Swiss-Prot record:
Subcellular location: Endosome
Name of the gene encoding the protein in the UniProt record: ANKRD50
PROSITE patterns on file: ANK_REP_REGION, ANK_REPEAT
Protein name from the UniProt record: Ankyrin repeat domain-containing protein 50
Residues covered by region (Disordered): 1108-1200, 1217-1296
Biological process annotations from GO: endocytic recycling; protein transport
Gene3D superfamilies found in the cross-reference section: Ankyrin repeat-containing domain (1.25.40.20)
Intervals holding ANK repeats: 477-509, 511-540, 544-573, 577-606, 610-639, 643-672, 676-705, 709-743, 747-776, 780-809, 813-842, 846-875, 879-908, 912-941, 945-974, 978-1007, 1011-1040, 1044-1073, 1077-1107
Sites bearing Phosphoserine, chain numbering: 1165, 1167, 1222, 1400
Length: 1429
């Protein structure tokens, strides 16, 4: 038996015809989606209580979820902007190495709404499809078990799901998901084209007018989604009524050409296709390249426009030179294409086929199409029909199951819109319905129940001017099996349902379905009268609580309303959302029904659960006559909803001028503010309704009223200006009426500063003419000039300079306007400022010059302009870095080239010792490394710690880059200050492939460090058996001894690596070798309890322990127990650098007690500082803010995405880039690699913890360990008594040294606990210990050196965009690779801290200390921490 949710699942909704199609660009969208998913994960981790699944009143909660993440993401864009293509790529990635390859694994379920297939718009099918996919996904174990409840299964039955979709969605999807254990990573539910099938006017209120749609279901329940599930929807930006339903969603626009990265997408799409398609490239010459530049401009961000034109070029249907003649809109393109496709009267011949396709409620097969068209022309043969399909071949595509559909739904809409398609190409869907109705008539006796419903639908929509009874006779006389047509699903269309009932469809009176059919079929008075006469209750309610009267009022059936009122229907029964018949009729604008209900005494001031009255609903929807009727009846004009918004506020927002005047004339309070302090004037100014603003001012509106953010009407008008919508005239009017032009909001921002930031040059002019202060600074020290420069608004910059703006202003971080403009990237702004005399060598607080900014951001033209003006290419910042190093680090090839040409020192090192070659290599910028080698860069240059680049690449396991260095002459034996080579560190970490490469380049396998430790000993210590075998095979000395006399066998026996011991013994290791202190492998194995190793050693002839228990012989030296805080240094956390590619090499973290300053190592080496440095080019700490609930968002952005060009054209113009494709294909091009590192190591000084260690030979008990104030341990207070006990113990028992090897490095003198001891000769006994500084020593160290601040959760933005190039990649990584320990944790006892940071053992192991020494940090953490605009 199949599950009920699998019986009726629409396959069309779970697939995309674009699957497998090549996808280009849009990387920035995937980055944003990954970031949103990560936010969900973070919120899920911090969530305490799941949301309560209680239905709200219908209006969605505004804002975002209480845990800080948005409810979901809404992809918006015009027709053809690539929404469905993006969703398809997200689910079925076409590129194996793309970011979306990882994102598609987080898809829990998906649904594609398609207007061409009504089944995909069915809410019941949507719910069943989700359930089936979640069960199949395997991502949530146990979900299917929660569906075994018979009550849940009954809700999923066909028909039941359609009758009560809200209940089915809650019981079958939401409640089971809320009851599941959160998955390891957040998941998403994708619904594409959620607005399809929602054909409503913009003014209607969404909560009822969209009832029964997928959009309404999601909008009413998205706040109840589990915190780990992200709802991802797409919709057209024109579908305002739908997009408003998803308040609190993060909206991502795909065709907002104000965003540079969207323009870049369009350009890259063209370039990618040129690069991939020879058939397209052969049409390209330098003369026709300009045509493609025109194409990218004409497309206005519409990828469908680009695709149709470029496909036409490939098919030789369109010539490139004809692009100049193609209209610049999608509708214009359709008209142009039809004029090309259909000559003379060809369109009339194929028009019937298009009519049928437009009328069909699902995709039709070729046979079905032929049968329908044949009913109009019975002489049509199948061959003739096929020829007509061939004429339409460029407009039709293959659907599922050998069906034919139009290539895009926007073209279907165009064919029915006479305004755009003209009379010549106008199609008639009603004619298509007639042909389909006749086709069904011919086969009426053999129709299935669903086909019978389709038959009824086509009859209803045929415009045959027949009454319903006559259409019912049509179906009956043709023998249509109507009786069982309602046995499975109930049609959504009420007229279809009524026709089927009249034609004899059977309704089971015992089934609860009856109430649903009664509600939906009662469109006509005679039907209601019949039912009431047969005993039906006049006040019966459906599952949503709506009465017959409420449904009739909602649909505007005046006759039915009169009948029900005459039969005594209750006028005040509320439905589940608190709506009465009057509020429903007012919301829909049914004036006659409203008058009828008012005349019958309905309560005109009734409020629903959201506080909406009939008056506010009508005012919002723009229903003038309804508003007049209610006002005439004496309604309270200032009733407000839950947000204190009145009818006047709603009408002002909606732009309904006549309603605003009517309300004002009836005494509406003009200055009444909502909960956010916004009046009707602010709402009208924000929306750009000048006439309404004028009416409100004429009636006494306070022009300088502030909202909760301190913004006035002028502030929001300057903020939201699109000049085409009349906002500039609103600004002018407000200034004329006395608006304060220099009014500051809570952030200290004036309208001028906001307008400058947004780039509204007309408004800037108006404000300056009105007396605005051109040099006003906000709370963060930003002037309008700074704001305009940060966003690259050249026209605004010129205007401000014309009005005398001061050019020498400096922000809170010491940056001039030129510095900020250089970071932003608009060369016109930079040249303008240079012409004004700004210092091209000005240093900000971090020592960065404008050239540093431009080089870091990769602005080639700006680098050229600055250098031409005299900028010094070798100027160092506070960290000793020149612009050349920054450009190399970020992978900006063209900038590196320019700086080299202008005498930048190729081997210049920063104070951390890293040069351009080092940072480029670690970031993986192969092309830049090649360029540096070609200019003579020193391949063996060492950093401040004496480590060569090859050493660091080996440490990071960057195999490819290390091999490239070796090919270019890197010294394979180059060592660090401790004598360790690249082979040492690779063996320590177990990087087998790296070891093989180093040996292949003749690395000495027996090379020893300063302590005479070999690579074999390092590998043995870590237990890397394969590395040990490899080294022995290549001649490693098995019994090589270090300074202490220990061999690899002794070390492996101590660490318990039995497989390594086995290999060493097999290759002749001496099992009886003893070190300087007489410790053999057998002895240390016995001490550590490694019984299997003891047996193995005995098998190979090791001397036994003669039956003696190891306890008295091998116990630790008896010393006084000391507090753990004096033995263990502060908490250390290691996270892999993003540059590391080694798998499975993450070593145990150095665990300890954060009693002193905490520190962290993000990487074994110095990871590049790209993330920290990227913040240098931002403006100030706070970005432009707006209220939490409105759409008064001000943050614009430019180029947030790291779009990887198809070729490196070094900032050529787009036309020049296109022309490059006309060159021979053998021409080599360099590609630009996006920076990937997001981590950075903490600095280490000569006093770093890795320099001094103290290893206790007694393992203290955690239970007796406590921390005292000031970071002192109990050991300090009890030193006298402890020392006495120790003396007694030592005198009564012989001293036996424990087998512990010395520290890997001994750089400095060893100090006693609590004091800074001068250097002195250590006794031999002490040299056998790893020394660790006490808590008192640690406290004395510089807090800045060790204390790591965790990156704040707030997203850092630069000029309105993310400054971290990989903010989207920070899934489970620590941001910037650093972790801070809360001060409260530092103050707790050590036992609590260790419980918070679980450790496999209670003390610091020698292996971990050794690991710390090898993977030591670098002194590069004192970089400037920037704050953005």
């Amino acid at each position: 038996m199949t599950n009920p949710w699998e019986e009726k699942v629409c396959k069309m909704a779970q697939t995309s015809l674009l699957q497998g199609k090549q996808f280009y660009c849009r990387e920035w969208v995937f980055h944003k989606l990954q970031h949103c998913l990560q936010e969900k994960s973070n919120c899920c981790n911090s969530a305490v209580n799941a949301p309560s699944l209680v239905m709200n009143s219908g209006n969605n909660a505004s804002g975002v979820s209480g845990k800080g993440a948005a409810w979901g993401v809404l992809l918006v864009g015009g027709p053809g902007s690539g929404k469905t293509a993006l969703c398809t790529e997200l689910l079925w990635p076409s590129s194996p190495a793309s970011l979306q390859r990882g994102l598609h694994r987080q898809a829990l379920a998906f649904h594609f709404c398609k207007a061409q297939d009504s089944d995909t718009l069915c809410v019941g099918g949507f719910i069943r499809g989700l359930v089936a996919q979640i069960c199949r996904s395997g991502l949530l174990q146990g979900y299917e078990d929660k569906l075994r409840d018979p009550a849940v299964q009954s809700l999923l039955q066909p028909g039941e799901c359609e009758r009560n979709p809200a209940e089915a969605f809650k019981r079958c999807v939401l409640l089971p998901l809320l009851g599941m254990k959160p998955p390891q990573q957040s998941l998403y539910l994708l619904v594409d084209s959620v607005d399809e099938g929602c054909n409503i006017t913009e003014g209607e209120q969404t909560s009822t007018s969209l009832s029964g749609t997928v959009a309404a279901l999601l909008a009413g329940h998205h706040e109840f989604f589990p915190p780990w599930l992200l709802l991802l929807c797409s919709a057209r930006k024109q579908s305002k009524a739908v997009t408003k339903m998803f308040t609190g969603f993060r909206k991502i626009s795909l065709d907002d050409l104000r965003k540079a990265y969207i323009v870049k997408d369009v350009q890259q799409y063209i370039l990618h296709r040129l690069d991939q398609e020879e058939a397209l490239r052969q049409h390209l010459t330098k003369e026709t390249a300009e045509m493609l530049n025109q194409l990218h401009i004409k497309s206005s961000g519409c990828f469908l426009y680009l695709e149709r034109v470029l496909d036409g070029v490939v098919e030789n249907f369109i010539m490139l030179r004809e692009i100049r003649d193609i209209p610049g809109t999608l509708n214009g393109l359709y008209l142009w294409l039809c004029q090309r496709l259909f000559v003379r009267k060809q369109f009339a011949k194929v028009q019937p086929i298009l009519n049928v396709i437009l009328a069909a409620c699902r995709p039709l097969t070729i046979t079905e199409l032929y049968h329908a068209v044949w009913t109009k022309n019975m002489s049509l043969t199948l061959e003739d029909f096929q020829r007509k399909l061939d004429i339409l071949s460029k407009l039709l595509v293959d659907g599922l199951g050998n069906t034919k559909i139009l290539f895009h739904y926007s073209f279907a809409e165009w064919l029915l819109d006479v305004k755009h398609c003209t009379q010549k190409y106008l199609c008639n869907a009603a004619e298509g319905h007639r042909m389909l109705a006749m086709s069904y008539t011919c086969q009426a006796k053999n129709l299935t129940p669903l086909e019978a419903q389709e038959f009824a639908l086509h009859l209803i929509n045929s415009n045959l001017q027949l009454e319903t009874a006559e259409l019912a006779l049509w179906m009956i006389w043709n023998g249509t099996p109507v009786r069982d047509s309602l046995s499975t699903l109930i049609p959504k269309e009420q007229e279809v349902l009524q026709l089927l009932v009249k034609a004899g469809a059977h309704v089971n009176s015992e089934d609860d379905r009856t109430s649903c059919i009664v509600r939906q079929a009662l469109e006509r008075e005679d039907s209601i009268r019949t039912l009431l006469d047969n005993g039906a209750s006049v006040n019966q309610c459906d599952s949503n609580g709506r009465t017959l009267l409420a449904n009739a009022a909602y649909s505007g059936s005046l006759d039915v309303v009169n009948l029900l009122v005459s039969r005594g229907a209750d006028l005040e029964i509320e439905d589940a959302h608190g709506h009465t018949p009057l509020t429903l009729a007012a919301r829909q604008g049914h004036t006659k029904v409203v008058n009828c209900l008012i005349g019958c005494g309905a309560n005109i001031n009734h409020t629903d659960q959201d506080g909406w009255t009939a008056l506010r609903s009508a005012a919002w929807g723009g229903h003038t006559e309804v508003v007049s009727a209610l006002l005439y009846a004496g309604v309270k004009v200032d009733c407000a909803d839950a947000d204190s918004r009145t009818a006047l506020r709603a009408a002002a927002w909606g732009g309904h001028e006549d309603i605003v005047l009517n309300l004002l004339q009836h005494g509406a309070e003009v200055n009444k503010a909502d909960n956010e302090g916004r009046t009707a004037l602010i709402a009208a100014a924000y929306m750009g309704h000048r006439e309404i603003v004028e009416h409100l001012l004429d009636h006494g509106a306070e022009v300088n009223h502030e909202d909760v953010d301190g913004r006035t009407a002028l502030s929001v008008a300057a903020l939201c200006v699109p000049a085409s919508k009349g906002h500039a005239s609103v600004v002018s009017l407000l200034i004329d009426r006395g608006a304060e032009v220099d009014h500051c909001d809570k952030d200290g921002m004036t309208p001028l500063l906001v307008a400058a930031y947004e780039g509204h040059v007309d408004v800037v002019d108006l404000l300056l003419e009105g007396g605005a202060d051109v040099d006003h600074t906000d709370n963060n020290g930003r002037t309008p000039l700074l704001a305009a420069a940060s966003m690259g608004h050249a026209s605004v910059v010129n205007t401000l300079l014309f009005w005398g703006a001061a050019v020498d202003s400096i922000d809170s971080e010491g940056r001039t306007v030129l510095s900020i403009a250089s970071a932003q990237g608009n060369v016109e702004v930079v040249r303008t400022l240079l012409d004004r005399g700004l210092d091209e060598n000005h240093r900000d607080d971090a020592g960065w010059t404008p050239l540093h900014m431009a080089a870091f951001e990769g602005h080639r033209l700006i680098c050229e302009a600055l250098i031409e003006q005299g900028a010094r290419t070798n100027e160092i910042d506070n960290d000793g870095r020149i612009p050349f190093i920054l450009a190399s680090q970020e992978g900006h090839y063209d900038c590196v080239q320019i700086l080299l040409e202008n005498k930048s020192n190729i081997d210049q090192r920063g104070y951390d010792g890293r040069n351009a070659l080092r940072v480029a290599a670690l970031e993986g910028h192969r092309d830049i490394v090649e360029l540096l080698f070609s200019h003579g860069a020193d391949v063996n240059c060492k950093d401040a710690d004496g480590r060569p680049t090859l050493y660091i690449l080996a440490l990071e396991n960057q195999l490819t880059m290390a091999e490239y260095f070796l090919e270019n002459g890197a010294n394979v034996e180059a060592s660090d200050a401790e004598g360790r080579t690249a082979l040492h560190v690779s063996c320590w970490q177990g990087h087998m492939e790296m070891v093989q490469v180093l040996i292949a380049y003749h690395a000495d396998v027996n090379a020893a460090d300063n302590e005479k430790r070999s690579a074999l000993q390092s590998a043995a210590w870590q237990g890397h058996v394969k590395v040990v075998q490899l080294l022995i095979e290549h001649g490693a000395v098995v019994d090589h001894t270090c300074n202490q006399g220990a061999t690899a066998l002794c070390i492996a026996a101590q660490e318990g690596h039995i497989d390594v011991v086995q290999v060493l013994l097999e290759h002749g290791a001496d099992p009886n070798h003893a070190d300087q202190f007489g410790r053999t492998a057998m002895r240390v194995a016995a001490k550590n309890g490694h019984s299997q190793i003891i047996k193995l050693l005995e098998k190979y002839g090791a001397s036994s322990l003669n039956g003696c228990s190891p306890s008295p012989v091998h116990t630790m030296e008896q010393k006084p127990l000391q507090s753990l805080s004096s033995k263990v240094q502060s908490l250390t956390i290691k996270s892999n650098s993003s540059g590391s590619t080694g798998g499975g090499d993450m070593q145990p973290s150095l665990r300890g007690l954060p009693n002193g300053p905490t520190h962290a190592f993000s990487s074994p080496s110095e990871s590049p500082d790209s993330t920290v440095d990227r913040q240098k080019s931002s403006l100030s700490n706070n970005s432009l803010k707006s209220s939490k609930n409105s759409s008064l968002r001000t943050t614009s952005s430019t180029a947030t995405a790291q779009t990887v060009p198809i070729d490196s054209f070094h900032n050529l113009s787009f036309t020049e880039q296109i022309q490059q494709h006309s060159l021979p294909r053998s021409r080599s091009r360099q590609s630009i690699v996006s920076p990937s590192s997001t981590t950075q190591s903490l600095g280490q000084s000569h006093n770093s913890p890795s320099s001094e260690f103290e290893w206790s030979q007694v393992k203290p008990s955690l239970k007796s360990t406590k921390a005292s104030k000031g970071g002192k341990s109990e050991n300090s207070a009890k030193s006298g008594s402890a020392g006495k006990k120790a003396k007694q113990s030592n005198s009564s028992q012989p001293k036996v040294l424990e087998y512990e090897m010395t520290q890997f490095d001994r750089r400095g003198p060893i100090a006693k606990s609590g004091t800074a001891a001068p250097p002195k000769q250590m006794p031999a006994e002490s040299q056998c210990k790893i020394m660790i500084p006490s808590a008192q020593q640690e406290i004395g160290r510089s807090q800045q050196q060790f204390l790591i601040h965790q990156q704040s959760g707030e997203q850092k933005k630069r000029n309105g965009i993310m400054t971290n190039p990989n903010y989207h990649l920070q899934s489970n990584q620590v941001f910037l690779g650093r972790v801070s320990v809360p001060r409260t944790m530092q103050d707790r006892g050590h036992q609590e801290v260790l419980e918070g940071y679980p450790s496999s053992e209670t003390e610091l192991s020698l292996k971990q200390a050794l690991k710390l020494q090898i993977e030591g940090s670098d002194p590069s953490f004192n970089y400037k921490k920037e704050t953005p605009l």
